[in-house]
Amino acid sequence: SLSHGKYYALGSGPARAMATKVKDGAVEPVEELYKELEYRDSHDKTVLVIENDAVPPVEIVEKVAAACGVSPADLTIIVTPTSSLAGGVQVVGRVLEVAMHKAHALHFPLENIVDGTGSAPVCPPHPNFVKA
């Protein structure tokens, strides 16, 4: 999650797999999952999709860019309110990701998964964030 002051949002996309931090003098992924999987993306540009109805403050943009090792100009942020069609598609589009997280949490050997597919209904947009 991303937060600064009163701003809070969830993020997804390649930036999550690129973001690192220094802990006890060592560089490691920000997300524990990527640390456990010993996985990290590396590129000179990246993208982050944010579930929120407001553009993030510059402090979040700078923090994400720094964690990914890119300049803020090379970070594309897509803002998708959950109450919008794009936000709804973005949420249900991660159904397979959620299944993989569950398999990992249950200690299923992920190397045994060679293919996957998922489906979920796309709810119609609703102006109320909670109902969406």
Curated annotation (Swiss-Prot):
Catalytic activity: 5,10-methenyl-5,6,7,8-tetrahydromethanopterin + H2O = N(5)-formyl-5,6,7,8-tetrahydromethanopterin + H(+)
A GO molecular-function descriptor: methenyltetrahydromethanopterin cyclohydrolase activity
Pfam families, per database record: MCH
Top-rank EC class of the record's enzyme: hydrolase
UniProt GO cellular component terms: cytoplasm
Listed GO biological process terms: formaldehyde catabolic process; one-carbon metabolic process
Swiss-Prot/TrEMBL keywords: Cytoplasm, Hydrolase, One-carbon metabolism
Family assignment from sequence similarity: Belongs to the MCH family.
Protein name: Methenyltetrahydromethanopterin cyclohydrolase
Source organism of this protein record: Methylomonas rubra
Lineage, broadest ranks: Bacteria, Pseudomonadati, Pseudomonadota, Gammaproteobacteria, Methylococcales
